[in-house]
From Swiss-Prot:
Protein name per Swiss-Prot or TrEMBL: Large ribosomal subunit protein bL31
Organism name: Cereibacter sphaeroides (strain ATCC 17023 / DSM 158 / JCM 6121 / CCUG 31486 / LMG 2827 / NBRC 12203 / NCIMB 8253 / ATH 2.4.1.)
One Gene Ontology term from the biological process aspect of the record: translation
Keyword vocabulary terms for this entry: Ribonucleoprotein, Ribosomal protein, RNA-binding, rRNA-binding
Domain of life: Bacteria
Lineage: Bacteria, Pseudomonadati, Pseudomonadota, Alphaproteobacteria, Rhodobacterales
Pfam families per the UniProt record, alphabetical: Ribosomal_L31
Length: 73
């Protein structure tokens, strides 16, 4: 591989919605930083069978529902 053209690949901490933390190698952030997830397999309806509540960050879900209200979504 050529030197100096690839991003730094280092260890970061990932914090799940339930508070658990695990380490993973990534190009995100800097060595030792923590990435806090808003949606993960524990809180996403696709993996929970619809039992988890979807968080409306930025009003995107509300905007979608209002835009397509007449279609029965």
């Amino acid at each position: 591989m050529k030197k100096g053209i690839h991003p730094d690949y280092h260890m970061i901490d990932v914090k799940m919605t339930d508070g658990t933390v695990f380490q993973i190698r990534s190009t995100w952030g800097k060595e030792g930083e923590q990435m806090a997830l808003e949606i993960d397999p524990l809180a996403h309806p696709a993996w929970t069978g619809g039992t988890a509540k979807l968080m409306d960050t930025g009003g995107r879900v509300s905007k979608f529902k209002n835009k397509y209200a007449g279609l029965g979504f």
